[in-house]
């Protein structure tokens, strides 16, 4: 129902799913294993414990009364996030348009991702070690991104291709912007984007080398009738 759609809307990446899972675990009285270790608190029967690894996976434990040598019951689930990943050093300008170079993850249908609103989620770690959480494109006041496609009257040859070839992986670069710095003749759009990133989001282009950014749909879940 509504709570499931809310989880999907707020959990478009592994990190975001883990954040929500930790919040739910705490509400259910689970405690962080790392905190128990720091405080030298012994684990006892009845304890409810969670552990996260690199902020991208989570394990929850209900401690029983039997010895662990007798085994344990395991219930596993997979956090799957269909997405397109931003490469390191991704930014380039072509024909007065700025793009970010990408590579796609796993089993996506590439033609699903063109000419639709997209958002950028992830983490940027600056050269001084500062960590910035990024979520651009999900709110109405945010800029919107897209992967370009051919117009219908220019795509007749394209439409004859097999579905796996209609959109090639190399064509999945993200359009970031087209507005140049005024009176700049060379890479004016790049300069505008760089100024915007620093002013609005607190990082510069070189910080993308140590970033983990993912392209996800900029839409919310809706109920089917």
Named regions from a protein language model:
Residues 1-222:
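N-terminal hydrophobic/helix-forming segments and targeting peptides
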């Amino acid at each position: 129902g509504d709570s499931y759609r809310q989880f999907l809307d707020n959990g478009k990446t592994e990190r975001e799913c883990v954040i929500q899972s930790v919040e739910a675990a705490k509400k259910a009285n689970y405690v962080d294993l790392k905190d128990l270790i720091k405080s030298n608190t012994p684990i006892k029967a009845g304890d409810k414990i969670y552990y996260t690894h690199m902020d991208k996976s989570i394990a929850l434990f209900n401690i029983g009364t039997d010895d662990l040598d007798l085994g344990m019951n395991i219930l596993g689930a997979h956090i799957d996030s269909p997405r397109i990943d931003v490469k390191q050093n991704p930014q380039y300008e072509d024909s007065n348009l700025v793009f970010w170079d990408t590579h796609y993850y796993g089993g996506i249908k590439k033609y699903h991702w063109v000419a639709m609103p997209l958002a950028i989620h992830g983490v940027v770690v600056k050269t001084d070690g500062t960590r910035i959480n990024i979520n651009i494109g999900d709110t109405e006041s945010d800029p919107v991104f897209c992967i370009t496609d051919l117009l219908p009257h220019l795509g007749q040859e394209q439409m004859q291709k097999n579905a796996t070839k209609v959109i090639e992986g190399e064509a999945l670069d993200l359009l970031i912007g087209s507005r140049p710095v005024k009176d700049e003749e060379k890479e004016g759009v790049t300069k505008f984007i760089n100024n915007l990133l620093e002013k609005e989001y607190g990082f510069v282009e070189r910080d993308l080398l140590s970033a983990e950014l993912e392209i996800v749909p900029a839409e919310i879940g809706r109920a089917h009738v």
